[in-house]
């Protein structure tokens, strides 16, 4: 009959299906893709160490100045005296204590002057020269401050305990305030030594 059409369904065989190309191309092999990894900029941890370095230097200044003030202001006069003698103790009676004050003052001044160099290391963490300079100078200050603190500590020990073999009596029973002040100054100086040692370790890690 006219106007009518007949639809005929043709079933494909498996062989004919294999011969046809796939509609979607397979994804390319993973080996052909180049992965671009953007590396984080270096120097982040070095900048953090440099900031901590500045904080430690400020703490070292406080400890060194505390040692200088405590030792430099040490002065005690006993309330009794004789016709010819007045019993008085001052830090400059002993050259070791005088050296102690000078050495810790030098250390405090150095730490203050080294802060701008340490700030440069914060701004430019990759610079090696300033860090090497600070490491060298910190090591010198460790030696100076340790010598001053060790010498003063030996005198403080004798002041507290005396020495029976040398017939040196302990004086801290009479000059109690004097001994307390010089002992505090020695402790502050050793704290400065510890701070300087930490600064050397930080500088070594920052190189």
Swiss-Prot record:
It is found in: Cell membrane. Residues 1-24 are annotated as: Disordered. GO terms for cellular component: plasma membrane. Residues 1-48, 120-138, 206-207 are cytoplasmic. It is a multi-pass membrane protein. Keywords: Cell membrane, Cell wall biogenesis/degradation, Membrane, Transmembrane, Transmembrane helix. GO terms for biological process: cell wall organization. Residues 1-12 have a biased composition (Polar residues). This is Casparian strip membrane protein 1. It comes from Taraxacum kok-saghyz (Russian dandelion). The lineage of its organism: Eukaryota, Viridiplantae, Streptophyta, Embryophyta, Tracheophyta.
């Amino acid at each position: 009959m006219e106007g009518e059409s007949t639809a005929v369904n043709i079933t494909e065989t498996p062989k004919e299906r294999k011969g046809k190309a796939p509609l979607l191309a397979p994804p390319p092999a993973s080996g052909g893709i180049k992965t671009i990894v953007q590396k984080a900029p270096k120097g982040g941890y070095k900048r953090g160490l440099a900031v901590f370095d500045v904080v430690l230097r400020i703490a070292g200044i406080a400890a060194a100045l505390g040692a200088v003030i405590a030792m430099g202001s040490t002065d005690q006069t006993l309330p009794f005296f004789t016709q010819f003698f007045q019993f008085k103790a001052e830090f400059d009676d002993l050259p070791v204590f005088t050296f102690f004050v000078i050495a810790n003052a030098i250390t405090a001044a150095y730490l203050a002057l080294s802060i701008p160099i340490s700030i440069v290391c914060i701004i430019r963490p990759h610079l090696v020269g300033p860090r090497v300079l600070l490491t060298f100078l910190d090591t010198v200050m460790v030696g100076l401050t340790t010598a001053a603190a060790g010498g003063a500590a030996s005198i403080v020990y004798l002041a507290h305990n005396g020495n029976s073999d040398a017939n040196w009596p302990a004086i801290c029973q009479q000059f109690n305030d004097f001994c307390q002040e010089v002992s505090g100054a020695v402790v502050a100086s050793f704290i400065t030594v510890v701070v300087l040692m930490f600064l050397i370790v930080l500088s070594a890690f920052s190189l």
